[in-house]
Structures are given as structure tokens and as C-alpha cells.
Amino acid sequence: MTKVLIVDDSALMRRHLKEILEVHGGFEVMVARNGIEALAGLESFDPDVITLDINMPEMDGLTCLSRIMATKPKPVVMVSSLTETGAEVTLEALALGAVDFIHKPDGTISLNVSRIEREILDKVTAAAKARIRRSLGLSSRLRTASDRGAAKRTRPADSSPLPTLSLTEIGVVLIGVSTGGPGTLEEVLPGLSAGFPWPVVVAQHMPGSFTPVFARRLNDLCPLTVIEASAQMPLEPGVIYIAKGDADVVIGHRATRFVVNPMPAGPHYLWHPSVTRLVESALRALPPERIIGVLLTGMGDDGAEAMAEVKRRGGRTIAQDEASSVIFGMPGELVKRGGANLVLPASRIAGQLNAWMSRTKETVYGTGQS
């Protein structure tokens, strides 16, 4: 029996979430109206999973989450709106240690909650099995972002953008990630060195209203430029492209340039942006030896078979290890298929990519500088 603490100031929302879990079976549920009641329930009920609203009286969700992670860490699933403000706060919650989020329905709650019943059950069930990722803490991350932003603004002249690569020179790093991804990407991507010679394309399962906010957030954290991918955008060395949420993204070429192109969510793919579709498009567009695939934490198996094919054809792949994954679903499936050249903790992935790229820069540009 999984013990779930539902924290929400809306009596209707509490009731519907409780009914969904109890009707399905296998859940014991306690409810709380605000963060203060949640902290009391943390001690008396000792839940396996907490669903946590963001906007509540007396103590808001972020404050409550910080207290939970500081005193008695538990897997927390945030309940968030799809507004830009909701996206910003939810991403902050994920950075503080929440494992996932559920979209709070707009309009008629009773009708719209039923539409996301499967999502609620899947995410609460997965959260119960999740590893809690320790965050740096808000003040530490803000200092890190400030330092990186200053470094980006004061980058010396000899670290100017790399020359555009031709179709016969350029390669691409593809990163696929789902549950636990925002916090993991905030650990991995800032470690990529200035002057990284290949573009990086990231498919993070996320709503469309979240990805532009997430791209801006990562841009503040990273020495490389981070942008949300848009139609027919040329792939440039040292730029990180975030796939637009609720859609897919593919790689193709136009004239003498490779481009990244958002596409409507494909019906043959279960998750979006689809890691599988992204990797398959790269295999059609580029020689496999110029593809590096990285599969990070997440539920399911999106991207696992496609990245295994990259390895089979002579490309390189990295799977995040189980110990550092919030959910060892996607990377675990890659490992099961024998599709990972390396299995690494999140803390070592950027360093490995930098090492590979250092050799690439020496070959293409005649320099070994990283």
C-alpha cells in the first residue's frame, strides 16, 4: 500500500485526487490544506509520496517543499498550472528536489481532472519508486547562475563562436530525458565547456508552455547559448537547442546546412517531444559516427532502441547510471539492449562529452583547446 499525502487548498481538487487514487486501489491517502498541515502530516502519516500544490495560504508550495527536503526528504509531485508563471515556479520546485509535476486543470475541475487520471496514477506510482535527487539549494544555484552569466558576458575574444561547420564536418549530441530531467539537465549542461564544437539537441518530455521558460533558465545557467528550437533553425556549433514541448523535433538539412525543425506530435510516438523520433531523424541525416546519444533519467523506454541503433552503427552513446537517476527507466532500457558505450553518473557526463569534443576540435579546427 502506497501512502500518499495530497496537499492542496482547493477542497474540490483534494477530493478528486483522493477519489482517483482510492478507486484505483493500492493507495492510502491523507489530505492537507496548506504547507503547515503538510509538514504535520509528514511526521504523523509518513507518506511515501506527496502531491503538492504551489499557491496556498499560510505556507506556499515552494516553502513547504524546501522544508520537506531539508527535514525529511520524500518524493514530491508538484501540481502546477500551465501559465508562464506556473512554469517558472514548477521548474524551481524541480530544481529544489521535486521529482515530477502534474498539470492543474483549468475550467471545470471535475471534468478536467478525469482527463488526466492516467497521468496522475502513472506519476504518483513512479514517484513512489523514485530516488530523491539532492539539490544544491536555491542560494547556491542562484550564485552559480550569476557566476556563469558573468562568465558568458565577459568571455575573452579567443573564445568567440566557432566557424560554421559543413555537412561533412558537423556532428550532433542528442540528449533524451523525462522524469527528473530538469534538475539533471541543470547539472549536466552547465558543465559543457565554452567552444563546444557540436550543437546539442535536447528532447525533454514537457508541456509546450514550459519549454521556452526552461530554455531561458538553462541559458542563465550555462556557458553555452541555450534556445528553444524553432522552424528550420540552422544547427550551430556550441548551441543547445531545447525541443518545443507537446511537439516533436527532427533534424534535416537545407542546402549546405543541417537544421532542426519542430513537428506536430507524431501519433506513433507515446511521449513528446519524442526522443525516438529525434534520434531516428538524426540517423537519416548524419553518418552515425557523428552522432552522440545521451539518455538520462525518465520513465519508460523512449529513445532506448533508437540510441542502441546509433551504437550498433558506430556512433557513441551514454546512459545515466541507476544511482544518479530519479527513474532508471529510459537509461536502464538502453543498458538492457546493450546500447550504451558508457554508463555514467550525471556528474561525469559533461566531462566525458568535453573529452570527446576536445579530440573532435583538434581534428576539425586544428586545436586541442576545450
Curated annotation (Swiss-Prot):
It catalyses: [protein]-L-glutamate 5-O-methyl ester + H2O = L-glutamyl-[protein] + methanol + H(+); L-glutaminyl-[protein] + H2O = L-glutamyl-[protein] + NH4(+). Phosphorylated by CheA. Phosphorylation of the N-terminal regulatory domain activates the methylesterase activity. The modification 4-aspartylphosphate is found at residue 53. It is found in: Cytoplasm. GO terms for biological process: chemotaxis. Residues 166-360 form the CheB-type methylesterase domain. One of its GO terms (cellular component) is cytoplasm. InterPro entries: CheB-like, CheB_C, CheY-like_superfamily, Sig_transdc_resp-reg_Me-estase, Sig_transdc_resp-reg_receiver. Its main location: cytoplasm. Keywords: Chemotaxis, Cytoplasm, Hydrolase, Phosphoprotein. It holds the Pfam family CheB_methylest. It comes from the Bacteria. One of its GO terms (molecular function) is protein-glutamate methylesterase activity. Belongs to the CheB family. Contains a C-terminal catalytic domain, and an N-terminal region which modulates catalytic activity. PANTHER family: PROTEIN-GLUTAMATE METHYLESTERASE/PROTEIN-GLUTAMINE GLUTAMINASE, PROTEIN-GLUTAMATE METHYLESTERASE_PROTEIN-GLUTAMINE GLUTAMINASE. This is Protein-glutamate methylesterase/protein-glutamine glutaminase 3. It comes from Rhodospirillum rubrum (strain ATCC 11170 / ATH 1.1.1 / DSM 467 / LMG 4362 / NCIMB 8255 / S1).
